[in-house]
Amino acid sequence: MMVIAIIFMLLAGITGCGRQAAGADESRFPEGNSEPMEAEVLKDSAVAIQVNSEIEELEQGLSAGRYEGEDGFTAFLSGGGAKTDGEVMQFLADSFFAENQGAFTMDTQAFGCSTLSVQNSEGDYLFGRNFDWNTCNALVLISDPQDGYASVSTVNLDFIRQGAGMAGSLLSDDMMVIAALYAPLDGMNEKGLCVSVNMIQDRATIGQDRGKTDLTTTTAVRLLLNQAATVDEALELLGQYDLHASMNYMVHFAIADADGNSVAVEYIDNEMVVTRTPVLTNFYLAEGEKQGIGTSQSHERFDILTGALTEKPSMTQADVRDALDSVSKDNFGEFESTEWSIVFDQSALTAVYYHRENYQKSYSFRITD
């Protein structure tokens, strides 16, 4: 089962998610690189990445891509959205890949998260995230849609599966990037709004039926990244749609904005419940009979992150990184890897990624030029 540790920081947010079956084929994505990305080494030893092409490999298991222009999401919503990941992929096949029907499917699997929201000494906010899973192929995706906010998000490409009988070479970069737009697990947009998905280990699921346009877990994340500037706007948007949990896994959302507002959005008996909190892991926070249900490890990670906030109410990017490190896989041993850790700067609009618990090397992305 994936594990994601999410910490909401008033300056940055930290999130971690995911777990996949062992033995992932890391060579499948991307298939051959063209010209390398532009990069420069910064004073903090981060590598600044300028994404110039659709998919470029940064290191084994971590790639970056960019999409600009019409992403089809407005048409997706106006057509009624989707109740399942299969319906999402059918929309993409019909809209973008009519000649490649059945080329791929989406296979979202169980995951968990921890997030933290905190303020820095300049009064800005950071958001941090860990994604814990087995080894996988991750894509950092810069999106600049025609009718929405630009954003950076992270996608587990192993959730996007090849259809039966399709060779990997037939899954072009174009197809993978389009599919990835509809499968983000976390991200930040140009307004500084951060979103992360966290799993809750509970037999209950989410299947709202109020006659509204339907969204899956990951398309809800895309909706917020494209259209919400603040937590209040995000909550208003979520209330306008019927949410359906991907693969029937119970999830909750960590959402934080550039003004320091941070909330957990949970669904109890298909009713949306909002709890203001700087820390979120993998158990219910909402008051009531569900409160506390989740893994014992998620309670431990929550306590660690809460303690870090108590000790340091104001944090630097390095402090957030260290907080994420403190709840990474090596401290618990339950999962194969913390696949990625992110520190989002909600004022500078940068995202600093650490891959597979190598906290001495990072990649820095900027949403806007």
Where are these regions (language model features)?
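A surface/extracellular/periplasmic glyco- and lipid-processing/surface-interacting theme
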Residues: V195-V197, D202-D330, F335-S337
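N-terminal mature-domain region immediately after signal-peptide cleavage
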Residues: A12-R222, N226, T316-D369
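Intrinsic disorder/low-structure terminal segments
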Residues: I7, R28, N282-F283
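Bacterial N-terminal signal peptides
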Residues: V3-G13
